[in-house]
């Protein structure tokens, strides 16, 4: 039986638990103007997307989707470090208005939060989702249906949050959704803890990469992200590959992001994130007009109270220092809201 849009919305509103597929009625009739076709459209028309899906699913047999390289057979129900099952686990799917302005536009970024995570930071603000694994298991066909729903209600993109461990499911769902009419860009919203080999499977499919670069020091990464000592090496290599694939941030005539790299860096107390080194690395390895968001919203969450160096929020001075470093190294693609926050802080001094 064909599921109508009304039935889907009725069934998708699951409160107090895992899925909140918010319909936002005031935006339901909005039509976003899309410039051209997204990358996955070209791959499908060239006959390459089906091959990529098959190749990606093969990684489940001996899972090495992320740098942990657990080697478990997820096809047989084994679970590795991230604790993810074979089926994709989704916590929420809804328009999100707190992302970067070019992603949000007027009608929101179509954000899908996946449960579980391959990094498991001790300060994670989404720890019930990423670490405890709250969410509902759905088939790839259901994920495709969510993508279509988000497009139908006017979202400007499909924003895939914490996608690394479910990348094969995403690829299959995207192909299914394309056949049903999906035509908006894919945003790969990742912690940055990626393998270049895996990212190459996404070449031509992902339109916008939205990675974190959390740390520039191996000891900090090991301490605060569950032993991921190789995080700086893996994240910087991953970002270089992302830049090779999609280049710099591009928007349409309405200011809506269509493609490109958008880097996030969270300022942490006591210079834990290595922000000065981060700014220098971007300046030396990427175009200086690369989109960079210096984030000020660190707060103490999950197990951060157990670690003295990060057991407080950041100070105004720490944020201003971070922005000064970005400008000192000539970064001109700074997120406009970060710049406005900086200016407000300076005026209040």
Place the predicted regions along the sequence by residue.
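Auxiliary Fe-S-binding modules of radical SAM enzymes
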Residues: 2-5, 9-23, 29-76, 247-349
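Residues immediately within or flanking Cys/His clusters that coordinate Zn2+
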Residues: 60-63, 67, 79, 111-114, ...
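Iron-sulfur cluster-binding cysteine motifs and their immediate structural context
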Residues: 65-83, 122-129
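Conserved Radical SAM active-site core
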Residues: 83-204, 208, 218
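Conserved radical SAM core fold
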Residues: 130, 167, 192-195, 213-232, ...
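Hydrophobic faces of well-ordered beta-strands that scaffold small-molecule active sites
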Residues: 158, 186-188, 209-211, 261-263, ...
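Non-cysteine beta-strand/loop elements that form the S-adenosyl-L-methionine
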Residues: 203-217, 291-297
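Anionic-ligand binding region
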Residues: 233-252
